[in-house]
UniProtKB/Swiss-Prot annotation:
Organism: Mycolicibacterium smegmatis (strain ATCC 700084 / mc(2)155)
Family of the protein in this entry: Belongs to the universal ribosomal protein uS15 family.
Ribosomal protein recorded as keyword: yes
A GO BP entry: translation
Coiled coil location: none
Signal peptide: none
Purpose of the protein: One of the primary rRNA binding proteins, it binds directly to 16S rRNA where it helps nucleate assembly of the platform of the 30S subunit by binding and bridging several RNA helices of the 16S rRNA.
Name of the protein in its database record: Small ribosomal subunit protein uS15
PANTHER family: RIBOSOMAL PROTEIN S15, BACTERIAL AND ORGANELLAR, SMALL RIBOSOMAL SUBUNIT PROTEIN US15M
């Protein structure tokens, strides 16, 4: 269920500012989005897994806060990010 090192490296290569970038908001949002997608698929099969559902809600809230920060700092970066990730906003 957790992201493998290869998956993280691939995501960070696409969305990070440089190869070893793990701290930029874009990289963090991209990693959170992948984790949210994986958890959503898990919960489609395991509908009664309430602990994972709570974890999903926490991840969504964290991603929302990071996106809010990016929107406040630079609207162009925010729009580019949500377009590349395919998020509805």
């Amino acid at each position: 269920m957790a992201l493998t090192a290869e998956q993280k490296k691939e995501i960070l290569g696409q969305y990070g500012l440089h190869d070893t970038d793990t701290g930029s908001p874009e990289a963090q949002v991209a990693l959170l989005t992948k984790r949210i997608q994986d958890l959503t698929e898990h919960l489609k099969v395991h509908k009664h897994d309430h602990h994972s559902r709570r974890g999903l809600l926490l991840l969504v809230g964290r991603r929302r806060r990071l996106l809010k920060y990016v929107a406040q700092v630079d609207v162009a970066r925010y729009r580019s990010l949500i377009e590349r990730l395919g998020l509805r906003r």
